[in-house]
A protein has these predicted regions:
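Histidine/acidic-residue-rich, glycine-tolerant segments that coordinate divalent metal ions
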Residues: 82, 90-100, 107, 124-236
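Acidic/His- and Gly-rich active-site-bordering loop/insert found
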Residues: 2-101, 110-127
Length: 236
């Protein structure tokens, strides 16, 4: 596979992919509600010649194998939006009030569709198998778990997974790719709850009560200091 030829073929898809991205951007959907997005992407893949499997509550998976043995690599793109009202004045502005693609998942899904098209062109050159995953509910941290439980990483068993995420508002030129070391491709977060129980008291004797608001504020400040003072930038 000649790199320059591959880039040329990718550039030739730009107009088509821009139309797809604008269409997806106009129809943002939340969490597992993929009534427009899922069939839209499924149809695009089927038009390329892929057999598409619905995995989990709203996910899509398809595979492509070459004529040479090799490992199975998963390429993953998320496709859900956020409950945010879009104020940008663009032709492809969200048509769904209170919803918008504010995190670039419309672009992620579009790029994976573009990759799927190029992989079909170069299928004979693929060593092993490439599995393509379109994941819902990334913003609520539920989509990946749902698809994994439904067998995403099996049949064939996945050896490694690759995801990508666009970024804005940083001093980087368009087209640059950042790859952190240590096998970690993207930072994430975890959710947890802390319950602070107070104790009521009379206004004349506050020393006998427990001020839960002040205690919670101190906890919040202490947790923030861990990130800003105890962990070096770039560490996880």
């Amino acid at each position: 596979m000649d790199y320059n030829e591959l880039i040329k073929q990718a550039e030739e898809l730009q107009g088509e992919l821009e139309e797809i991205r604008h269409d997806l951007h106009q129809h943002p959907e939340l969490e597992f509600d993929m009534e427009y997005t899922k069939p839209y992407i499924k149809t695009k893949l089927e038009q390329m010649g892929y057999e598409v499997e619905e995995v989990g509550k709203a996910g899509l998976v398809t595979t492509i194998s070459g004529n040479k043995p090799g490992k199975t690599i998963l390429l993953r793109a998320d496709m859900d939006a956020l409950p945010i009202r879009e104020e940008a004045d663009v032709e492809f502005k969200s048509l769904c009030e209170g919803k918008m693609h504010a995190c670039g998942h419309d672009m992620h899904a579009t790029m994976l569709l573009g990759a799927a098209k190029l992989l079909k062109v170069h299928q004979d050159e693929i060593e092993g198998t490439i599995k393509l995953e379109f994941q819902p509910a990334e913003e609520v941290f539920k989509g990946s778990e749902d698809m994994i439980k439904a067998g995403l990483l099996e049949n064939p068993k996945v050896d490694a997974a690759i995801m990508f995420h666009v970024v804005a508002g940083v001093p980087m030129p368009t087209g640059m790719i950042m790859v952190p070391g240590g096998g970690v491709s993207m930072t994430s977060c975890e959710q947890y709850h802390i319950t602070v129980t107070g104790k009521s008291g009379h206004g004349s004797m506050p020393n006998l009560s427990i001020d839960s608001i002040t205690a919670a504020a101190q906890i919040h400040l202490a947790l923030q200091e861990i990130n800003s003072r105890e962990i070096a930038p770039g560490e996880y």
